[in-house]
Each structure stands twice: as structure tokens, then as C-alpha cells.
Amino acid sequence: MSQPRQQQVPPGATAGMVPRPDHGEHSYRGSGRLAGKAAVITGGDSGIGRAVAIAYAREGADVLLSYLNEHEDAQETARWVRDAGRTCVLVPGDLADPAHCRSVIDKAVEAFGRVDVLVSNAAYQMTRDSITDIPDEEWDRTLAINLSAFFHLTKAAVPHMRPGSAIIGSTSVNSDSPPPQLLPYDVTKAGIANMVGSLAQMLASKGIRANSVAPGPIWTPLIPATMPPEQVESFGSEVPLGRPGQPAELAPVYVMLASDEAAYVSGARIAVTGGQPIL
């Protein structure tokens, strides 16, 4: 299975993707598993974040979506959330700025009075063949958005989280099997996995759980926006299932980790990789 060669300008947009990703718009059915919860989802405009937002809303949660500047995608995601009868707050801005991370949480508390679920999902990457090709500012930005923002968001959110709340970090199969062309991204995803392990222990006494999801190759706007067209064409073909995953195929895992069903699940990393193992 392959996609046609295509290229977008970062950070990418859903509308230009062929084929269009499946976020569960027409398939996800909720059953009240997150009824009454308030969730913050970064990178919530598209890709995995959109699929999680749709699933959370259909499970009964209100949602704040943090995103950079992809307003069209964000508005479409918000429409799906509101169609489910839930509140959706949109907060654009750059998570590389610690002050903006704090502002995201402040706006969630203003809207909902608390944070029950924090999903740190926003990510940045670029493909480079050599370490000498990586600009210093690209290294810094990748770490700031992918890893440091997770720290700043969590630090700001914890005082507003009650026992039973959940923190979920989006890591990657790359934390175990790092492709050399994504060096800064690989580093951040390993860092998220380790941060989650520390948070699970640090926050246990507060009744707050921390877990991560390790996706394999998932068909999101980040792919045509950050990879050469020939890599886009074969994206996902290397895993045992022979295809990229769809965002909708990850959403149920994020729902489970946010739900009370996962009350004893903390410090875990769940792989959704199309058969590629993580250790």
C-alpha cells in the first residue's frame, strides 16, 4: 500500500492530503466513558489530535484544542466536537514559548474549572541526512515543541488536576528504533517516554496517572510536510502490516488511558505500531 508522492509546506494541512486521513469522523461511537471530563489536547487541529478530540467528545468530554496556526483544520475539528454536543475551546499559538504553554492551561481552567486529562501531542520534525545539515534553531525548536512544552504544560496543569486525572504523552516507535534522518525528533520522543516514567512515580501520591502512546507510522499532515515526496510514497510500508496507520486507529488507546477503566495503569507505554515491536 502506498500514497501518491506529495509535498506540503510545514506544518501541513489535512485538506491537501491524498488520501485524506481517517479520524473516526464517521466511525467512532462513544459510550460515556469520559462523561463530564475536561481535556486539553495539544496538536489538536489535525492528525492524531483530531482523532482523539472527536473520540473524547463522543465519550462525553469537553475539549480545549491547542494548535499553532492551522485555523481551517482547527475549526473543522471544533465542528466535530461541537456536533457531539460538547464544548470546544480553540487556543492558537506557539508551544515553543513556555508562557504560551501556561496560557493554554489558564484558558482551560477558565473554561472548565479544572484539567482532568492532558494530552501532549503536538510535534515538530524535519528530515535531514546528516547531523551537519541540522540547523541549530531546528534542533532547539524540535526540543522546545516536542519535549519542553510537555514539561511546561504538565507543570502548569498539575495544580488543577484532581485524583483520577490523567496525563498522556505522545511518544513514538522512534524512541526504540530511531531512524537517523529524524535525529532531533527521535531524541524528544525518547525523552517523553522517560518523563512519563518519572511523572507516574512523582504524581502517584496525588492520584494522577501518567502514560504514553507510542505510534508507528501514522498518516498525518506532518508526513507530507516534513518528508521528501519519495519517502511519503512508501511511508508505512516497512512495518509488518505493510501500511501506515490512520489517526482513528489510535484514538481508542487515548480514550482508555483517560478513562476510569485505566485506574491502575500508570507509567505505561502502549505501542500502536502496525506490528513493529518496542522494547
Report each predicted region and the residues it spans.
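The beta1-alpha1 cofactor-binding region of Rossmann-like NAD(H)/NADP(H)-dependent oxidoreductases
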Residues: H71, P92-I105, D136, A248-E249
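Short C-terminal tail/terminal secondary-structure segment
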Residues: P4, M17, E25-H26, R128, ...
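Short, small/polar-rich loop/turn modules that mediate ligand/substrate recognition or access, typified
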Residues: A204, R209, V265-G267
